[in-house]
Amino acid sequence: MEVDFGGGYLSSDGGGLILRELERHSGLLKDFADCFIDYRDQRYIEHRVVELVSQRIHGLLLGYEDLNDHDHLRRDPLHALICGKSDPLGQDRSLERDKGKALAAHSTLNRLELSAQAIDERYHKIQAQPEKIEELLIKRGVKAIARKSAEIVLDFDATDDPLHGKQEGAYFHGFYRDYCYLPLYCFCGNIPLFAKLRDCKRDASQGTVEALQKIVPAIRQRFGRKVRIIVRGDSGFAREAIMAWCEANKVFYCFGLARNDRLAEQLESSFESLRAQIKEGTVQSPCRRFTEFEYSTLNSWTKARRVIGKAEILLQGDNPRFIVTNLPKEGWRNAAQAARFEPAALYEKFYCARGDMENRIKEQQLDLFADRTSTHWLASNQLRLWFSVVAHLIMSTLQAEVLKGTELQGASVGQIRLRLFKIAARLTLSVRRIHIELCSAYPLKGLFGLVHQRLGALRTPA
């Protein structure tokens, strides 16, 4: 057996070419790059903003979380092709030390990430525009929602993002027992619409009304005012300001409700009845019963609202749970939905489905590295979070438009990366063409061919 490094230009990310073709049809990264102002002298630059953005986000999609990774990836001509470089071998670089390295080094990408800070006369010549980025994410996210949707569910949640040291905005959170950020997310299914990085010295729901004020008009502009919008969240979002805004703007909501003594009293009779039935042997533990009633807090709410209570007896003991909603018990005109918002169905089938958003946040942090917020400044960490959100939006578009009906339609980002992008590839470059050979033993050739066919059928944006 003999081993050497004479195999030529090889890459482990051959399937990343799918991302290149998807960008050609969607133009998302180009639009995202337009959210930056480039003050550099264009006569002397070698990496355009769109190429820097593409390099960073495609790196996340292909599993490379750290800027230091790009000091090695910049030598990979396949990555250069994915990012739109016309000279994938880097032979035309102006400095001799950079020849053979088509992509930017970590220092250049670092200056891009620090663009959220004030412009420095010498080093920081690219400026991010947060308002435009936020507007773009909402616009492209809403556009990704199925066009014929009659009902749109917006899931809100906050999560912890542990810090890496004494960073800007570092505070201790009593619930998570750590120093962390507290990002706020909004998803529609697997489509990210909003992500705000915040310090943790605040209520988890803070900023939800401001997010809704941007998201809801964008949805109604595309789908019309008749579309039903339902906001869903855990008990941290059962706040007067959010519920009152929804009621004033004809938006429905369904939130968890933290238990208290007054709420517990409403379930006493249900628990007594269940215990009697267990004693008689007519039911067995675990068992549950749902109750509906009107409820208002003593001070914080301005009106009584519909509350569903779940009296549940588990082997470990009683488990009372509550939700508050303005969804109509009778449903809407469609007879098929008549019982959809009855107490049991509303809690078990609709509210509990909120838990799927936890998987989206898990994908953000584990698969797309949204928790790699290790710069000192909050603003540059927000930009890193947006990079991960844009990457997630690309993957959700791929699943909806290309992977629909395939075995990867409902797969996680990590599974899609592993099974579709991580393909050994050899590049051969000549004067006239670039030839890419993929691994002969790749087990999903049929799926890859179908993806290629569907990408070719996508309409290029005007």
List the model feature ranges, each with a label.
Residues M1-D178, L182-D203, T208-G224, Q399, ...:
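Dynamic "connector" segments at or just before major functional cores
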Residues L22, H70, F341-L383, F387-Q399:
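Short amphipathic alpha-helical "interface-anchor" segments enriched in bulky aromatics
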Residues E151-D155, R228-I230, F252-C254:
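Structural preference for beta-strand elements that scaffold enzyme active sites
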